[in-house]
Amino acid sequence: TFGNGNLMSFGHYKNLIGFNGDIITGNINNSDDIKLLQKYNFDFIFHHAAISDTRVYDQEIIMKTNVNSFYKLLEFAKQKKSNLVYASSAATYGSLPPPQTVGKELPENPYGYSKYAMDQLAAKYSMENPNLGIVGLRFFNVYGPREFYKGSTSSLVIQLGHQILDGKAPRLFEGSNKILRDFIYIDDVVRANVMACKAKKNGTYNVGTGTARSFQDIADILQKELNTDFGTEYFINPFSGYQMHTQADISSSIDCLGFEPKISLEQGIKSYIPEIKRLHGSDAK
């Protein structure tokens, strides 16, 4: 459980309750902490420790944490002859029109660029080490249990769910029926990670549903599941250049990973409702 080296870490011990493996806590920016792993041998390394908040604009911190530390982990995987699955991001696409396709990237913030740089570094290592499995997964809009500790960066699903449980109308940007995202449930994301272990070839792959749904859809489905009819409160979108439409091209994910999403937005939210209710008003933070 390696933190990302700054105060934007979203890890929490409660997400580890019930885990029976060895737990070593460290900072991926610290080479001495990485050395703590030397006594272990790994078949696969899942690298999900990094800055994941797109609103962090300190370029030096982001590049050191996301890219420099990734280089250390690639060297570690090479030494251990371990296959590596790591988290890339749909932020590498910026505001390119849908469907977003691997090989067509235009990052528009330091976070997106750091993930793009990681993908380039992974490709270089793949060419130089053809027997080493290295797969990057570009996650789109993930939602589901165990994200609560991300606070304000948690998914729209849990944030709107708690607004509704507070007895309030969900608050959305004006025109939210036309703001589209590729929302994918965490269970599908976990499956994608597992299937990446047996990828036909190294590379970077999109992890989304291939279908875009609106912010308004989220609010409407939640109200249906929670048996409420509060309507929706709209406010002006304060962000200029706001991304209006993300939708993953998952053709290569199907071909090379065998990954196809199984859970629709309606099914995912329905499954998530008990957790949303349990956490409502909780001091679990």
List each model region and its residues.
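Short, solvent-exposed loop/helix junctions and linker helices
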Residues: 64-67, 112, 150, 154, ...
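C-terminal substrate-binding subdomain of Rossmann-fold SDR/epimerase-dehydratase oxidoreductases
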Residues: 165-285
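Short, active-site-adjacent cap segments at secondary-structure transitions
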Residues: 92-94, 142, 179-180, 214
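N-terminal Rossmann-like NAD(P)+-binding domain of SDR-like oxidoreductases, especially those catalyzing
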Residues: 1-140
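NAD(P)-dependent short-chain dehydrogenase/reductase
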Residues: 110, 123-180, 186-191, 197, ...
